[in-house]
């Protein structure tokens, strides 16, 4: 008996035409699930002691505007990635931030203003702004 029919059958079984198709929606949902897990992990790290002062959640309007601007998402992530290096015990957050760029939406135009400013070594400033930034990403995906 020839091996040709067996090889042909094997080829048909592994060809993409016979496998369940992966839609773009399925792929995006899976990708976003990974992104959401990374965001949750960062927030868990941010919620660990030392805890911030009572006025922690006060984020000025200009910072909020910068953090929600879609064209600044990548620039803001770069600012957080640089700022995390000046914090103690933040290596876990730093490594997750490195994996976050694929989760960001594509910018539709060049940024019109500079990215967010984070006070060097100020864990509360970093935490407050990063939490707002991450929540913005989550809220946008939920829409």
UniProtKB/Swiss-Prot annotation:
Glycan attachment residues as annotated in the record: 89
GO annotation, cellular component aspect: extracellular space
Pfam families named among the record's database cross-references: IL3 (PF02059)
Disulphide bridges: 35-103
Major place of residence: secreted
An annotated Gene Ontology molecular function: growth factor activity
InterPro entries noted in UniProt: 4_helix_cytokine-like_core, IL-3
Keyword Signal part of the UniProt annotation: yes
Keyword annotations from UniProtKB, A to Z: Cytokine, Disulfide bond, Glycoprotein, Growth factor, Secreted, Signal
Tissue: Activated T-cells, mast cells, natural killer cells.
Localization (cell): Secreted
GO biological process, one term: cell surface receptor signaling pathway via STAT
Signal sequence residues: 1-19
UniProt superkingdom: Eukaryota
Subunit structure: Monomer.
Similarity comment text for this entry: Belongs to the IL-3 family.
Job description of the protein: Granulocyte/macrophage colony-stimulating factors are cytokines that act in hematopoiesis by controlling the production, differentiation, and function of 2 related white cell populations of the blood, the granulocytes and the monocytes-macrophages.
PANTHER family: INTERLEUKIN-3 (PTHR48489:SF1)
Name of the protein this chain belongs to: Interleukin-3
